[in-house]
Amino acid sequence: MYNYLDFEKPVADLEGQILELKKLAQEQGSVEMSDEIRRLEKRSADALKDIYRKLTPWQKTQIARHPDRPHCLEYIDRLFTEFTPLAGDRKFANDEALQTGFGRFNGQAVAIIGQEKGSDTKTRLKHNFGSARPEGYRKAVRIMEMADRFQLPLITFVDTAGAYPGVSAEERGQAEAIARSTAECLRLRVPVISIIIGEGGSGGAIAIAVANRVYMLEHSIYSVISPEGAASILWHDSTRAKDAASSMRITAQDLFDLKVIDGVIPEPMGGAHRGKEAVIDAAGDIITASLRSMKDIDGETLKQERRQKFLEIGRNI
């Protein structure tokens, strides 16, 4: 059984009936229920298509936050070989919210940075729900510097509600760490590819997403502030997050139209959590195509194109 979202209730009811009938048929050794099971499966598939054909921005936000979506470490495990993680910022500590290291993608050595939310209570606490502290961004800068030094393409996976806003993080220079990470992205003379796999929240996301090629999963979101945060500022009422989401143009489709991103990666019907391997492989195909398109571009041109790309975003929005 999946973790169903509120708006998926019709599908949840039908799939619940299907499971009950399958269990009953197995217990009784009966094949007479197969026609009814097939009928319900068709109704369930049709209901899912109908719901996902007309998703609202707020519903997409809920899908982007779905606890069962594939996370950064799952992408790393499936797409890369010989992954060697690097830990620590050489200044204070290691931040598990940001996963960094080196590996091989289709045999090519690459640098990898990704935000990991965790998949259960224990790992979510370990990874601080994907909200990085200053030491996480300083660790990311370490990897960027090494990628530049050894001329390795950089691939980043973005999935965060935002950088950690706690007092301790502010005391250790959270704003400076985010700014330095963003600036380092702009300085690199290697191909940089960023994929937003869930939430892309505020400076915590942009700090590792200033890339030559930026892609979003079909039901991911990308914004300067969460819908709840925007609602709190605009209307002093966080419960109006649904209204805020509708106004903010935070979906992959909106941001592609605005030329903020370079493309949208399709998800299986029902979201990435219903077909993890398929969506990770689709992301891998995009990475392959992006690396191929940049392989003959010199480092200075890559740097200047990246800077120009983000200057244009600032001018046009």
Curated annotation (Swiss-Prot):
Which EC numbers characterise this protein's activity in its record?
2.1.3.15
Recorded GO terms, molecular function? acetyl-CoA carboxylase activity; ATP binding; carboxyl- or carbamoyltransferase activity
Q: Does the keyword Lipid metabolism apply?
A: yes
- Which Gene3D superfamilies does this entry report, sorted A to Z? 2-enoyl-CoA Hydratase, Chain A, domain 1
Keywords (alphabetical) are:
ATP-binding, Cytoplasm, Fatty acid biosynthesis, Fatty acid metabolism, Lipid biosynthesis, Lipid metabolism, Nucleotide-binding, Transferase
This protein's pathway? Lipid metabolism; malonyl-CoA biosynthesis; malonyl-CoA from acetyl-CoA: step 1/1
- One Pfam entry name: ACCA
Cross-referenced SUPFAM superfamilies, in alphabetical order? ClpP/crotonase
| Subcellular location per the Swiss-Prot or TrEMBL entry | Cytoplasm
Q: What class of enzyme is it?
A: transferase
What does this chain do?
Answer: Component of the acetyl coenzyme A carboxylase (ACC) complex. First, biotin carboxylase catalyzes the carboxylation of biotin on its carrier protein (BCCP) and then the CO(2) group is transferred by the carboxyltransferase to acetyl-CoA to form malonyl-CoA.
Family per record? Belongs to the AccA family.
Q: What is the official name of this protein in its record?
A: Acetyl-coenzyme A carboxylase carboxyl transferase subunit alpha
Give the species this sequence originates from.
Answer: Brucella anthropi (strain ATCC 49188 / DSM 6882 / CCUG 24695 / JCM 21032 / LMG 3331 / NBRC 15819 / NCTC 12168 / Alc 37)
